[in-house]
Amino acid sequence: MDLSTMSYGCTASRDAEATLNLVLRALELSGQRGVLLSGWASIGKGRALPSHVFSAESLPHSWLFPRMAAVVHHGGAGTTGAGLRSGVPSVLTPLAADQPSWARRVHTLGVGPAPLPLQTLTAERLAEAIREAATSPAMRQRAAELGRQIQAEDGLGRISELFSQYVDRWGRLRRDQG
């Protein structure tokens, strides 16, 4: 039995209890153990959970995600970035804002199954997506490759370089117009 993270911490759900029940059923159907990150939404807080589910309000994504078979989340920019960097396939269940775009991008990159919008999500569809993410050799390999590429990037150095170029260009523009 593999281990998957379910992160719905800041997703505003009208019915957190229904979301929790769906997630628990999906884990059961998929044969996965789960780490449920409850976060701000407090999903599952104070409720007895099955023995194959561990719950925490928060854990560092950089530590947790690489240890998982799959990461299931809403598709916010931060969680998506952490998932991509971890080198582990992601199952995205977008709700609103930029989440659908990130979900499509993860799928297009080959590091996650097709997006499963939270509004129409079923336990059966989520379980199938978790199984696919956790067991697809091609998806796992592509996620690992992309994770290594992202980890090798010098993001801070690159943004510093781009910012310097921008400042230089702006300075030249002002002098030329001056």
Show the residue positions of the predicted features.
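Donor-nucleotide binding loops and adjacent catalytic segments primarily
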Residues: 1-70
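Short amphipathic alpha-helical segments
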Residues: 17-18, 47-49, 83-86, 104-105, ...
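A donor-sugar binding/catalytic signature common to diverse glycosyltransferases
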Residues: 56-105
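C-terminal amphipathic helix plus adjacent low-complexity
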Residues: 123-178
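Residues at alpha-helix caps and immediate loop-helix transition turns in enzyme cores, especially N-
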Residues: 15-19, 102, 155
